[in-house]
Amino acid sequence: MANKRVFIAFAIEDEKYRVFLVGQAKHDNSPFEFIDMSVKQPWDTNWKTNCRARVKGCDGLVALISKNTANADGELWEVECAYEEGIPVMLMWINDERPALPSLLNDKRINIWSWPNLETFIGNL
C-alpha cells in the first residue's frame, strides 16, 4: 500500500493519542501506513490559512474524538475544513468514553479505534 497523506485532528489534551496513532502506523505488523500531516505546533495568526492548505493537500483526515473534542475549537475547525474541501474524514474514539458531541459531529459515524478500521479507511483513500 502506498503511503497516504493523512491529517490527524486532535484536541491538544489528546496529543499522546496522536503519538500512539503515528507509532501504530510505523509498527512492523501494522496493516496501514500514512504520512502524518497534522499540525504539531500552534500556527501564527494565519494558522487557518496554513491549516486549510495542509488539509487540502491530504488524502484524508482522521479526527481523534474524546471528551475534550467539544471544547477543541482548533480540532473542530480542522474537521469542518476537511468537510468543506471534500476530504474524506474518519472520526475515531480514543477510548471507551462516549461524551456529548458538538453539533458538527452529531449525525456522523464515529469508529472504534482498531487496525481494521484504520486499514479500511486509509486503504480506500
Q: Can you say where each PLM-predicted feature lies in the sequence?
A:
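C-terminal helix of von Willebrand factor
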Residues: 113-125
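Structural motif corresponding to alpha-helix initiation and N-cap regions
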Residues: 45-48, 76, 115
